[in-house]
Amino acid sequence: MTKKTQVGLIFGGNSSEYEVSITSAGNIYKAIDKDKFDVHPIWITNSGYVASEADSYKVLEEPGYMVEKNDKTANLSNLIELASRPELDVLFPIVHGNLGEDGVLQGLFRLIDKPFVGVDVLAAAVTMDKEFTKILAQRAGVPVAKWVSIKRYEYEDAKNQKLSYDWVSGQLGTSNLFVKPSNQGSSVGITHVTDDSNYAEALAEAFKYDDKVLVEEGIVGTEVETAVLGNDHPVVSGVGQIINADNTWYSYENKYSTESTTTLQIPAQIPAETAEKVQENALKIYQITECSGMARVDSMLRESDGEVIFNELNALPGFTNISMYPKLFEEAGISYPDLITRLIRLAEERYAHKKTILHKHD
């Protein structure tokens, strides 16, 4: 009998995307092939407490479950101890947001010498920052929405011209703007701005979540997403379409609320040559940011000329019931359990390759 792979499933975290992580982890736990894998959950509560394995199992079954003891003492050592157990063969982090998908956890996994699912340290750090990702996308020849970057020190300078809606909209050539934290996911902290009335409020909201805020031109058109899977030779899924109700956008509420007015359409109802361009751009961005394992790439099809405009790359896409990433590969013939298996095997392959690289001179 083949020995089953022991998987440490790490989820939760002190993040604005905590609930998304809990839901994603629960779905992975239910869908994983139990004939191939044993799951050892590691739950980080929303206050940063690393729970016991028994409590971690319980919250997967009851997402609203809370631990009675919530002492953060020696928390890092608790996480290291749980994640570095000899019996664990591979780690599967599904911690969204700050400290989870920005390279911090990935660096810890490298230090404790464990294979892990998803992108490595560099790609995690780079793709968490929307501005750096856009700069690299431009370098790869992929069109992006125009933007203005505002650092906190600029925001705190009352005389800075970037605090003027008229100046920024003039720079971007449109009154249709999105104000967003540069390092956040799930549309947290994003505001759609179309005039001066809520620009200051939008900046204040975004700066709650980051020290750098982007003001982007709003692209009028069709929102599409595609999924990428693999290491050195990645494959790209078909294209899915986000259909928003009139006068709405793909906000946090529309992504996760039961009262969402947004629907997902797979495959997207777009011309074949446009879908191919979306996939081609996604692959370019995946490779120039040195992603491995997985990523979801979001784009806009500009209504005026049909050009494919890169929006964002999510290197740790959600695995909720309504998440586009697993649905796109399901449409491509890769089931949810098989997708999880492939992600784990990709982590093992990358780890084995890393072991062949010399880190000191003989």
Curated annotation (Swiss-Prot):
GO MF term list: ATP binding; D-alanine-D-alanine ligase activity; metal ion binding
First-listed, main subcellular location of the protein, grouped into a coarse class: cytoplasm
Cofactor note: Binds 2 magnesium or manganese ions per subunit.
Binding site for ATP: 170-225
Chain residues that bind Mg(2+) 2: 312, 314
Binding-site residues, Mg(2+) 1: 298, 312
Gene Ontology biological process: cell wall organization; peptidoglycan biosynthetic process; regulation of cell shape
SUPFAM superfamilies in UniProt: Glutathione synthetase ATP-binding domain-like, PreATP-grasp domain
One Gene Ontology cellular component: cytosol
Pathway info: Cell wall biogenesis; peptidoglycan biosynthesis
Subcellular location: Cytoplasm
Enzyme Commission code(s) on record: 6.3.2.4
Signal sequence range: none
Catalyzed reactions per annotation: 2 D-alanine + ATP = D-alanyl-D-alanine + ADP + phosphate + H(+)
Residues passing through the membrane, by range: none
Pfam families xref list: Dala_Dala_lig_C, Dala_Dala_lig_N
Domain spans labelled ATP-grasp: 134-345
Cofactor needs: Mg(2+); Mn(2+)
Stated role: Cell wall formation.
Record NCBIfam families: D_ala_D_alaTIGR, PRK01966.1-4
Family (UniProt): Belongs to the D-alanine--D-alanine ligase family.
Name of this protein: D-alanine--D-alanine ligase
Species this protein is from: Lactobacillus delbrueckii subsp. bulgaricus (strain ATCC BAA-365 / Lb-18)
Top-level taxonomy: Bacteria, Bacillati, Bacillota, Bacilli, Lactobacillales
